[in-house]
């Protein structure tokens, strides 16, 4: 007799056969009633890798034992500590090692990148973003426009969703780039839209923007560690991201930045700081700034070593699993959840995120029948029974099954609780 592919027993079989199942044990889970919480919020804050504590302690021990000499001696010299995460980051984002650097935080890095790559002229001064962009991105873009004496009402172009569910077609994006092309100085686009969970064809967006003569940058906050990326091959000028979501580097973690290799030795204007000075002569303390080649030339201050340690722990797990295997499991998990919702609770939940796996990562954005009031009621009920998603105004519950630590049986637990709530 064939097993029902949407049964609990089939989910258990999928979990037992999962080649990545051991990775779950590498993370610390919050507890609820003496059990591991069912955690679907890796898109907001990833779980703590168990090895993070040891790596942070290693830095603390080195600080205690060596004090300032820890910059130049010890098991992991702080002078080059940021380079310990460089190769792993490059593999995750599809870049050359010298194109990436871990530094600052996302919005700080976005300002640094716009200082270099947003070069408005009389004819070409507009910035194109998606309508409903993450507020910090929009604040950064508006403030950059004002710094140049430009009015956001005139020079900020927002591409409105062309679907009732709030998503954007590639046709709409292409049409906007074509329509405004001669005015565009910069196209700034997300890898994944934070509210809808929609993933975009980044290579195509980069090609279209550059064909119009615009610089192109990506905010990869919800894409890095979630979907395969190929930043070098896509030809994007720059990208920025955070590490506290899918890369599990902890609250307020150090951010990440990509600068394409074609800019590695350029004389682009930049906001400079001493740690961006070339390493061989940095400690001569000379007044002339000589940038390090590649993305490291945009560094400002010495790296936050304690904050880099958890990222190092997480990247070891990504290297152990590999992005292709993580993506394959992610598509299975999210597809399984989609089937469960359509089959068992279609009258309760509407999926906002596109059904095409190429247009989403692991996150499904959900609206609850009955609107915001019912949505909040379900969200709070799920919290009360130890199932944690997150809420985004005005009416979206986001559920993100993360392949590093979520299981197929977690999806059944979620849907069973939705059924219980709906039947009450």
UniProtKB/Swiss-Prot annotation:
GO terms for molecular function: kynureninase activity; pyridoxal phosphate binding. Its cofactor is pyridoxal 5'-phosphate. Pyridoxal 5'-phosphate binds at residues 106-107, 134-137, 219, 222, 244, 274, 302. GO terms for biological process: anthranilate metabolic process; L-kynurenine catabolic process; L-tryptophan catabolic process to kynurenine; NAD biosynthetic process; quinolinate biosynthetic process. Keywords: Hydrolase, Pyridine nucleotide biosynthesis, Pyridoxal phosphate. GO terms for cellular component: cytoplasm. InterPro entries: Kynureninase, PyrdxlP-dep_Trfase, PyrdxlP-dep_Trfase_major, PyrdxlP-dep_Trfase_small. It catalyses: L-kynurenine + H2O = anthranilate + L-alanine + H(+); 3-hydroxy-L-kynurenine + H2O = 3-hydroxyanthranilate + L-alanine + H(+). Its EC number is 3.7.1.3. Pfam families: KYNU_C. The keyword Hydrolase applies. The modification N6-(pyridoxal phosphate)lysine is found at residue 245. It comes from the Bacteria. The keyword Hydrolase applies. Pathway: Amino-acid degradation; L-kynurenine degradation; L-alanine and anthranilate from L-kynurenine: step 1/1; Cofactor biosynthesis; NAD(+) biosynthesis; quinolinate from L-kynurenine: step 2/3. Signal peptide: none annotated. Homodimer. HAMAP family: Kynureninase (MF_01970). Belongs to the kynureninase family. Catalyzes the cleavage of L-kynurenine (L-Kyn) and L-3-hydroxykynurenine (L-3OHKyn) into anthranilic acid (AA) and 3-hydroxyanthranilic acid (3-OHAA), respectively. This is Kynureninase.
């Amino acid at each position: 007799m064939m097993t029902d592919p949407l049964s609990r027993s089939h989910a258990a079989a999928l979990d037992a056969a999962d080649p990545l199942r051991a990775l779950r044990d590498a993370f610390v889970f919050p507890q609820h009633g003496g059990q591991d919480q069912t955690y679907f919020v890796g898109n907001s804050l990833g779980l703590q890798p168990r090895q993070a504590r040891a790596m942070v302690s290693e830095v603390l021990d080195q600080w205690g034992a060596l004090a300032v000499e820890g910059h130049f001696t010890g098991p992991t010299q702080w002078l080059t500590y940021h380079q310990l995460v460089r190769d792993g980051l490059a593999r995750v984002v599809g870049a050359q090692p010298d194109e990436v650097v871990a530094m600052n935080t996302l919005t700080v890095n976005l300002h640094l990148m716009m200082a270099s790559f947003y070069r408005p002229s009389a004819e070409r001064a507009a910035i194109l973003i998606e309508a409903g962009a993450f507020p910090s991105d929009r604040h950064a873009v508006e403030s950059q426009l004002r710094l140049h004496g430009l009015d956001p009402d005139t020079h900020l172009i927002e591409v409105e969703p062309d679907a009732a569910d709030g998503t954007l077609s590639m046709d709409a994006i292409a049409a906007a780039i074509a329509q405004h092309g001669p005015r565009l100085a910069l196209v700034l686009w997300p890898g994944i839209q934070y509210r809808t969970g929609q993933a975009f064809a980044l290579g195509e967006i980069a090609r279209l923007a550059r064909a119009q003569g615009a610089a192109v940058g990506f905010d990869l906050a919800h894409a890095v560690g979630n979907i395969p990326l190929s930043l070098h091959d896509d030809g994007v000028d720059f990208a920025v991201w955070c590490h506290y979501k899918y890369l599990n580097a902890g609250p307020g973690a150090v951010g990440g930045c990509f600068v394409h290799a074609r800019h590695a030795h350029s004389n682009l204007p930049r906001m400079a700081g001493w740690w961006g000075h070339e390493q061989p002569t940095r400690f001569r303390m000379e007044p002339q700034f000589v940038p390090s080649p590649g993305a490291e030339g945009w560094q400002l201050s010495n790296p936050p070593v304690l904050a880099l340690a958890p990222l190092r722990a997480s990247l070891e797990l990504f290297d152990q699993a590999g992005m292709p295997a993580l993506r394959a499991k992610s598509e299975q998990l999210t597809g399984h959840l989609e089937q469960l919702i359509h089959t068992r609770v279609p009258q309760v939940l509407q999926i906002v995120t596109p059904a095409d796996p190429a247009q989403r990562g692991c996150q499904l954005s959900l609206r609850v029948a009955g609107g915001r009031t019912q949505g909040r009621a379900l969200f709070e009920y799920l919290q009360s029974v130890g199932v944690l998603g997150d809420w985004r105004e005005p009416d979206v519950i986001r559920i993100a099954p993360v392949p590093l630590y979520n299981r197929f049986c977690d999806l059944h637990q979620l849907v069973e609780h939705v059924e219980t709530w709906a039947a009450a």
